[in-house]
Regions:
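Alpha-solenoid helical repeat scaffolds
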Residues: 1-178
Length: 178
């Protein structure tokens, strides 16, 4: 219930958490169909510096993703990536929204850029490898990417699942089940 959730949020009196609180409020509003109001709530949080500006853009895109407004979220993330060039995490989020919009070439290009900027970004290796395997393309490359992700985060269940998928796609059914 949105009213009860807002009552709990009212109890948080910490300026350091203002964006987090407003993002949660905005998500509640967006789920009620009040998207314009939700976005304004996030946009009106005061910025103390560039990191706050970046966080606000991520928060607004998160609210949009919650209500499956992939195109709007993607637009914000593209603008954020232009404003904060070289930010691997923003680029990763942009790639994930490109994938939702079926802009696979963009997703692949941006994920490769993420890996270039941040060679230990296991999510980027996994997303790219899984995407290739899911489309049954360049399976040896897909497996290499997922193996790299697994080296970086050996206990990540999503990466373990991706490895099973690529092994299945390459006909290694017994290994896939392990």
């Amino acid at each position: 219930d949105a009213k009860a959730a807002n009552a709990w949020l009212d109890k948080i009196d910490n300026p350091q958490r203002a964006l987090e609180v407003q993002t949660r409020r905005a998500t509640l509003l967006a789920r009620q169909g009040k998207l314009r109001e939700a976005r304004m709530l996030v946009q009106q949080v005061p910025e103390r510096g560039p990191e706050d500006a970046r966080a606000k853009l991520l928060a607004e895109s998160q609210v949009l993703r919650e209500v499956k407004r992939w195109g709007d979220a993607h637009s914000i993330l593209v603008a954020a990536s232009e404003r904060f060039p070289g930010d691997a995490d923003l680029l990763y989020e942009q790639a994930m929204m490109a994938e939702k919009l079926l802009r696979i070439d963009e997703m692949e290009r941006v994920l490769r850029r993420v890996i270039e900027l941040k060679p230990d970004h296991h999510h980027a290796y996994n997303a790219l490898g899984y995407s290739l395997a899911d489309r049954n393309l360049r399976l040896s490359e897909a497996q290499e990417l997922i193996e790299k992700a697994l080296q970086l985060a050996p206990d990540d269940p999503f990466i373990i699942d991706s490895m099973g998928w690529v092994l299945y796609r390459t006909g290694k059914n017994r290994q896939a089940l392990e």
